[in-house]
Amino acid sequence: MKLIKADNYQTWYIENLDKSIIIDPWLTNKLQPKGSFFIQRNKANDTILTDEEINKVNSIIITAPFEDHLHFDSIKLFSESTAIYTSNMVKKTLIKNKIKNPIEILDESGTVINSIKVKALPTSYPYYHSTFSIFFEDQNGNSIFHEGHRVNFKYLKNNKINADISILTAEESKLFGFIQLGMNY
């Protein structure tokens, strides 16, 4: 597996056997959803991915229904035949917004994408109803754990989930100054 941090925010790219998965793609310079007071972000570069790498993307994973994960302009950059893997909540939003791509639900039992076993795992408070973390394992046993919000350490310990690489949110953020939204390392 080849892993690339595709931007300076939270888009990730995983390539295996000349095909790739893109996670939470935000491939434009601006994220300013209409009517959104809370999310107004800009970045210098849209992505570090090459055109060749973008053309290898045959699967998109959307981990959360929030605008910085579910970015419609970025999804529309890919062919309508590009499969989207996500939650039931996000699937409803995609359909409501007339996204025509095939949409599959990820869960703990897992599915195989590009010869990688992909499992959706539970996150921690306050995100456990709306987001999921992801566990990837390739045909050689190499593994990656991805969590874009808050890790459910109890679940990982109880289920003996270990990974070669962990992708975690490294900055703490709090809503109204006291509800912890991001990790605090």
Question: Predicted segments — roles?
Answer:
Residues 2-6, 21-24, 117-123, 143-149, ...:
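Active-site-proximal beta-strand elements of phosphoester/diester hydrolases
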Residues 8-10, 28-30, 65-70, 91-94, ...:
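Active-site environment of divalent metal-dependent phosphoester hydrolases
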Residues 86-141:
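Metallo-beta-lactamase
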Residues 19-61, 72-73, 151-162:
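Pre-active-site segment of Zn-dependent metallo-hydrolases
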Residues 23-24, 57-70, 85-88, 144-150, ...:
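Active-site neighborhood of phospho(di)ester-bond hydrolases with catalytic His/Asp-centered motifs
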Residues 89-92, 153-185:
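Cap/insert and terminal regions of metallo-dependent hydrolase folds
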